[in-house]
Amino acid sequence: MRALISVSDKEGVVEFAKGLEQLGWQIVSTGGTYKILNENGVKAVEVAQITQSPEMFEGRVKTLHPKIHGGILYKRDDASHVAQAKEFGIEGIDLVCVNLYPFKETTIRTDDFDEIIENIDIGGPAMVRSAAKNFKDVLIVTSVLDYDEILQRLKEGTDDLEFRRNLMIKAYEHTASYDATIANYMNERFKGGFGDARFIFGNKVFDTRYGENPHQKGALYEFEYFFTNNFRALKGEASFNNMTDINGAVMLATSFENAPVVAIVKHSNPCGLAVKDSLLESYVEALKCDPISAYGGVVAINGTLDRALARKINEIYVEVIIAANVDDDALAVFENKKRIKIFTQDNKFLVRAGDKFDFKHIDGGFVFQERDVVSDDELKNMKQMSKKHANENQLKDAQIAWKVAALTKSNCVVYVKDGAMVAIGMGMTSRVDAARAAVAKAKELDLDLHGCVLASEAFFPFRDSIDIASKVGVKCVIEPGGSIRDDEVIEAANEHGMSLYFTGVRHFLH
């Protein structure tokens, strides 16, 4: 039996090759892999000895040869294939171990296009695809994580068809994602990311018990190993809906750099947020906005969950806590709470993945766009449209309200006072209804909106929302502007003695 080993990632390859040798396999290898194997006592045969053809064009051509691909592809149970292999002096290759040139890593490390091009693997994907096509006869190995299991199965004789089929699937996933990465990179470099095709792929992190509803299957996939590196379960398992809520909560909590932010989310909608002097104070103030909706919600903590904060959260039922870090004694507080789920990023503060693009599934396809981000320039360059100036505290609240509004389902309005969200209306078909809903909820909870700041993610089409805001004591309004009735909105703000600022940037969220 012969194994062809040609890998860019050399981790574990010596041990794997030695394991194969101990089982009686002959090792065939190329270039750097051949060198490291021989230096470590593996009696490998160089590919050039088999092909009788040297590496060409600075290593661009090594394994693209009938004696390699023929040895991989011929069917062992087809007499004509066996006869042809014998006729042309082609010996079988029964295992192919290949991982590919580090294209993605090269694009991160350098912008040198010549170097990037040289890290596009040609022979590697060809061998992987050949071996995967003939998976019944050839084991295809593309992951370091599979080395031990393959050796064990070969030793036991349990490398059955199902196992080989699973390796085949993994191999095609490997080459497909590799080619997609190259295509997306070229697209982004030369066409701004919006070429004729766009490839979206991820690696599975875990299956969820079900999808959005019990009759649907679900799973979490990741880009660039984000969750592998930044998500750990401390208590319980995340559901599909948990992950979408966690995403919304983390996006909110990470909108204010390293500030001690606590965000509370229910069904991906914010129902509480505060930026105070401590995480404990932020949680207490965030909860006041809508304690009814917070029941069974998701709490995101931009910092460490300590015992004091844990005890406060434990006074009500929340389903999920996601924190940058969690103290051991804080975790112990929830020891007897069976239903709560606790996750950490194991970081000092919560982090985002920094995805550059966003997409939404629609029936028959998807729409694709650049990710919406609130830039600092929007707030630095906002224009005062009213006669009255906002004071320093109001400007701070305007920043919070504006960032929350940008992450809230349209149409929305957000009311913030003293660093805490005090009312919110979202997902409404008219903006004035969002304003009315927010005020009604605040009155129901006996929350004082006097002196607060109002933000809207899109322009106010009429002055009616400003008139409603004035009745509850709003003192400052921030919105994009851009309505044909902006003059009426400005007039209303001046009539009610409000300060009004236009950012010039809309942040619809659907």
From Swiss-Prot:
Enzyme Commission identifier(s): 2.1.2.3, 3.5.4.10
Domain MGS-like stretches: 1-142
Lineage: superkingdom: Bacteria
Xref: SMART domains: AICARFT_IMPCHas (SM00798), MGS (SM00851)
Pathway, per record: Purine metabolism; IMP biosynthesis via de novo pathway; 5-formamido-1-(5-phospho-D-ribosyl)imidazole-4-carboxamide from 5-amino-1-(5-phospho-D-ribosyl)imidazole-4-carboxamide (10-formyl THF route): step 1/1; Purine metabolism; IMP biosynthesis via de novo pathway; IMP from 5-formamido-1-(5-phospho-D-ribosyl)imidazole-4-carboxamide: step 1/1
Domain-level remarks: The IMP cyclohydrolase activity resides in the N-terminal region.
Protein name listed in UniProt: Bifunctional purine biosynthesis protein PurH
Organism whose genome encodes this protein: Campylobacter curvus (strain 525.92)
